UniProtKB/Swiss-Prot annotation:
EC code: 1.17.7.4
Protein name (record): 4-hydroxy-3-methylbut-2-enyl diphosphate reductase
Binding-site positions, dimethylallyl diphosphate: H36, H70, H120, S216, S217, N218, S260
Cofactor(s) named in the record: [4Fe-4S] cluster
Pathway of action: Isoprenoid biosynthesis; dimethylallyl diphosphate biosynthesis; dimethylallyl diphosphate from (2E)-4-hydroxy-3-methylbutenyl diphosphate: step 1/1; Isoprenoid biosynthesis; isopentenyl diphosphate biosynthesis via DXP pathway; isopentenyl diphosphate from 1-deoxy-D-xylulose 5-phosphate: step 6/6
Catalytic activity: isopentenyl diphosphate + 2 oxidized [2Fe-2S]-[ferredoxin] + H2O = (2E)-4-hydroxy-3-methylbut-2-enyl diphosphate + 2 reduced [2Fe-2S]-[ferredoxin] + 2 H(+); dimethylallyl diphosphate + 2 oxidized [2Fe-2S]-[ferredoxin] + H2O = (2E)-4-hydroxy-3-methylbut-2-enyl diphosphate + 2 reduced [2Fe-2S]-[ferredoxin] + 2 H(+)
Family: Belongs to the IspH family.
Organism: Sulfurovum sp. (strain NBC37-1)
A molecular function (GO) term: metal ion binding
Length: 277
């Protein structure tokens, strides 16, 4: 069985930047998990004494606080500043872009539509920048737009890790029903590249392994894309989750990895699959 990596996979610019920031601030705490990868979080904890604050009460006066890659709600950032904790912002620049767009367009009187998962930390942060939360709407499907009190002029942004084709469905539905629609494509380039590369490989592979955190939006999107081309597509966090039966009788095993998956985990998975051959 041949093992082939997707032409684009793994750590994106924003995650690489955040990891470097954390490593340079040994002994600090991240506000929320820095990235959606438990193994890498544990590496930072063990090697660099990086702690975790899940809420404001977990932050002590002496803590230096690293803001997670996904960003945090505006009011929580303001409270951290009011507490005068040293703050190191590791929010991905691709995430601050929709934050700024939402702030700017809502100030100009536009309704805000955000395509994404309302429970995802990135989206919780982005929507908090709206001037009036009653005029900001989070949707995952175009059907959810029906009946919403959206104004005649609307600005739309996307969670950075969503599928472009799904974003277009939201945009098309808005254009059909609203006089002025301002579209801001805030999907990250790395997301495009990883998704396209995974799709191309999945077309040829007879088994696909997608590596990444189970709570990682971009990893789940990759798995969904692979599954649409290759029925035997599996999402794992590390090599311990591999099952020998997946590879029985297979000729080509494709591998992709989410944006929060470090190369050392990818290599561990490859080594384990090699051993199973």
């Amino acid at each position: 069985m041949k093992i082939q990596l997707a032409s684009s996979y793994g750590f994106c610019f924003g995650v690489k930047r955040a990891i470097k920031i954390a490593e340079e601030h040994q002994g600090s705490k991240t506000y929320g998990p820095l990235i959606h990868n438990k193994d890498e979080i544990n590496r930072l904890k063990e090697g660099f004494d990086i702690g975790l604050a899940e809420k404001l009460d977990d932050v002590t006066p002496e803590d230096s606080v690293v803001i997670r890659t996904h960003g945090i709600p505006k009011d929580e950032l303001s409270q951290l500043k009011a507490q005068e904790n040293p703050i190191i912002d590791a929010t991905c620049p691709y995430v601050t872009t929709p934050q700024n767009i939402v702030a700017n367009m809502s100030e100009k009187g536009y309704s805000i539509v955000i395509f994404g998962d309302k429970e995802h930390p990135e989206i919780k942060g982005v929507v908090s920048y709206a001037k009036d939360l009653r005029n900001a709407f989070i949707v995952k499907h175009e059907d959810e737009l029906k009946g919403l009190p959206i104004l005649s002029k609307v600005a739309v942004v996307a969670q950075t890790t969503r599928k472009p084709e799904d974003f277009l469905k939201i945009v098309n539905a808005l254009i059909l029903n609203h006089k002025e629609v301002r579209v801001f494509n805030t999907i990250c380039n790395a997301t495009f590249e990883n998704q396209d590369a995974a799709a191309e490989l999945a077309k040829d592979a007879d088994v696909m392994v997608v590596i990444g955190g189970k709570h990682s939006s971009n990893t789940k999107q990759l798995h969904s894309i692979c599954k649409s081309y290759c029925d035997d597509s599996y999402l794992i966090e590390n090599e311990a989750e591999l099952e020998p039966k997946w590879f029985e009788g297979k000729k080509l095993c494709g591998i992709s990895a989410g944006a929060s998956t470090p190369d050392w985990i990818v290599q561990n998975v490859i080594d384990k699959i090699e051993a199973l051959k």
